[in-house]
Amino acid sequence: MKTPTAAEIRELFQRYFEEHGHRRVASSSLVPQNDPTLLFTNAGMVQFKDVFTGRERRDYSRATTAQKCVRAGGKHNDLENVGFTARHHTFFEMMGNFSFGDYFKADAIAWAWELVTSPAWLGIAKDRLAATVFAGEGTLPWDEEAFELWKAQGVPVERIHKLGAKDNFWAMGDTGPCGPCSELHYFQGNDVPCAEEQAGRKCQGVACDCDRWLEIWNLVFMQFERGQDGGLTPLPKPSIDTGAGLERLAAVAQGKRSNYDTDLFRSIIHAVEGLSDKRYDAASDDGVSMRVIADHARATTFLVGDGVLPSNEGRGYVLRRIMRRAIRHGKRLGLERPFLAAVCGAVIDEMGAAYPETRENRAFIEKVAQQEEESFRRTLDKGLAILEGEMRKLVPDATHDGKPATPAPDRARPIIDGKVAFQLYDTFGFPLDLTRVIAAERGFDVDEQGFDRHMAEQRARSEWKGSGEQGVDDLHKQIAGELGEVKFLGYELPAARAQVKAILANGARVARAGKGDKVEIVTDATPFYGESGGQVGDVGHITGAGLEIRVDDAQRPVPGLVTHVGEVLRGEVAVGDAVELSVDDRRRDLVRANHSATHLLQLALREVLGEHVKQAGSVVAPDYLRFDFSHFQPVTEEELAAVERRVNELVRENAETETAVLKLEEARHAGAMMIFGEKYGDVVRVVRIGPSKELCGGTHVRRSGDIAFFKIGSEESIASGVRRLVAYTGARAVEVQQREAEELRRAAALLKAGALEVSQKIEQTQRRVKDLERALEEARSKAAAAQSGDLAALAKDVGGAKVLAARVEGDGKALRELADKLRDRLGKGVVALGAEQDGKAILLVAVTRDLTARLKAGDLVKEAAKLVGGSGGGKPDMAQAGGSDPAGLEKALEKVAELAARALA
């Protein structure tokens, strides 16, 4: 049988289950939707979580996927092991088949066995396979059914192993669906090292942590519901959730002991070889670094492709840790120039056919990688210098590279101060684990509790409130599961009749509500648009017999559910009532115009700035629109003008807005724009306005001319590689334009110029200011030269050198210039100058270079600064300090003279 490629295995797996009645479902984003409990998608079942719990309904009961997954950060974290083992990854693909109350154990086991062993499919040798089943634990019964089913497939009894709940019982949480699981393991051979045997104990076989028996597929049988009391109730419709890692299956099918030796990684590692001019040797330190880079480039490519950007919090921080770990391993390979973008390119070459979105976003992914690496490299050497300086303080006999001499066996490892580790994180972007690894390599530990304390203090100072990822109300999920999707009528109607299906008040479901109650009303249908996709929710009224509810907002807390948030102004509302729902159509018109303008804006930005521009967030409100987009430098005034001009051209074309409901793949092939990391269903709505074509569920104008006028208000950076633009439409845009014109008229009047001459007049004024500054500088320099001659005469001879301490007039710059001139005049000596400016003390100390081995300016100024209530530092030959108490200047200067005299005597 021909050895299959990983791409063939991925296709073969999904095709097998398609032939057995499963719907092939595309991988969801690595950023989980509506699941704040997860940092990243880490299993195939994540996108089906609400389907398994009954809170979401789909038009199929069997599914198969190849799901993008990341395990790095949080509970599921493989980061530290990556590169050092044959099978750990931050990014991996989890293939799976799922049954939502359809088939159960018999089919799941039979299909798994056939797919793995049949020569028509994977053709893996049966005599190298073993199965595990749940052995039972406490009140949980053993899974005799699974045991008999494996036996019926021909698996010998001695190769069906019973394991406890730790290995073979799965639960979604403390409560909810759970059940036994069953694993398929592949025997790699007794020559695979086992730590148990090396310690003189027996290898535990399938239960051992060694790689002799490699788990390749896990079948979860969801057959119980665990209640609050811990009791188990059989589910009326048991379900199946399975997961088979593509990387492991590829290694087994290709006869490789390491995932990194498969074709999934071969081309990526080959790219690293080419960049480093080194050959891959799996057993060497360089081999570890190449594996780290290959794995982390995959994670970087797919995380950035799903809209995650490097930052100092949340998901962005995990990505930054991954990227910077890869960059550091690149430096260990001798890669002194940025390389990560090129390796990400190799990942896209390898995986772009399976994940076309990586090809579409290639330029953006590579740019983010390049920018992050350049940023980190700028600070890496500075941070390492600080870390090595700290190591030398702790171990004075350290070598030149900061590596301490071998400590005595009973000597405790020296500890890097948590404050230093935090400074490296806060100032130089060193993730804590990077500091930990560098320290460990050189025989040091890190005070992680101290680091955490400083981190907590910083968050308190900046009133840090967390990532904002708050839990989704279980009541909303419960209602959505009971009622199904609320029908949206707002594309055609501003008002409609509907029936009240649920009422929430004070965080609880109630049967009725009366005047003054703050409520959330759920109806079976609604013309109200629930906030989503950046578009704010509608406002309006709900009325009925003697009833009036003011709707202040419409929300979409979970997919398919719209809640009307407001206050009962009159009468009473009860579940089952027939009501009239009316949207504030005038406000909706303003929102429509801003939403359609947002689509045209994205098109114009891509035309003017380039295809790398992607939406990174938006707000569509009645009075403005805000658009966040990927771009790596400030947008110039000329570019902004071109964007604004292009949008207004499209407005004047008065193109009709067209909508179509298409299958996701049809929309993709039609060239519709999609949003980074957005979760789309199998069927999507495409909105076309002239040349603009986007996937969108929002409300829009009938023709582009209804926007009337478009005006950009501001543009700024909000994160690395992300810009924010605020704009206006219609009457609000005219108002902004008029306000700007009025400001221009005022500026012209102040400058005594015409409106079209303002910039010219400002340039003239700037040139005049520069000329005056230059003249002032020359006068100051002459004054300093004259003053230096007078002051030099006051210097005292100490041990063959001159010491001068004097109070003068001037700012910090003037003191530096004067100190330079005095130092030159003295030839060999120490200069200390002090001045008062704006009620503060300024101190400056300069030491001639031939004396810096005996005394340092930084040490002198630190001591003196204490006497003026301040602090300072600098280089050995010049240092500066500031303080809040200028009354102490005389004593501070005397202190410098005293310390200098003592050192020189």
UniProtKB/Swiss-Prot annotation:
InterPro entries (alphabetical): aa-tRNA-synth_II/BPL/LPL (IPR045864), Ala-tRNA-lgiase_IIc (IPR002318), Ala-tRNA-ligase_IIc_anticod-bd (IPR018162), Ala-tRNA-synth_IIc_core (IPR018165), Ala-tRNA-synth_IIc_N (IPR018164), Ala-tRNA_ligase (IPR050058), Ala_tRNA_ligase_euk/bac (IPR023033), DHHA1_dom (IPR003156)
Cofactor(s), names only, from the UniProt record: Zn(2+)
Subcellular location: Cytoplasm
Chief localization: cytoplasm
Entry's cofactor comment: Binds 1 zinc ion per subunit.
Pfam families recorded: DHHA1 (PF02272), tRNA-synt_2c (PF01411), tRNA_SAD (PF07973)
Catalytic activity: tRNA(Ala) + L-alanine + ATP = L-alanyl-tRNA(Ala) + AMP + diphosphate
Disulphide bridges: none
EC number: 6.1.1.7
Binding site for Zn(2+): 595, 599, 696, 700
GO cellular component terms, semicolon-separated: cytosol
Keyword flag Metal-binding: yes
Domains: entry comment: Consists of three domains; the N-terminal catalytic domain, the editing domain and the C-terminal C-Ala domain. The editing domain removes incorrectly charged amino acids, while the C-Ala domain, along with tRNA(Ala), serves as a bridge to cooperatively bring together the editing and aminoacylation centers thus stimulating deacylation of misacylated tRNAs.
Annotated function: Catalyzes the attachment of alanine to tRNA(Ala) in a two-step reaction: alanine is first activated by ATP to form Ala-AMP and then transferred to the acceptor end of tRNA(Ala). Also edits incorrectly charged Ser-tRNA(Ala) and Gly-tRNA(Ala) via its editing domain.
Family membership noted in the UniProt record: Belongs to the class-II aminoacyl-tRNA synthetase family.
Listed name of the protein: Alanine--tRNA ligase
UniProt source species: Anaeromyxobacter dehalogenans (strain 2CP-C)
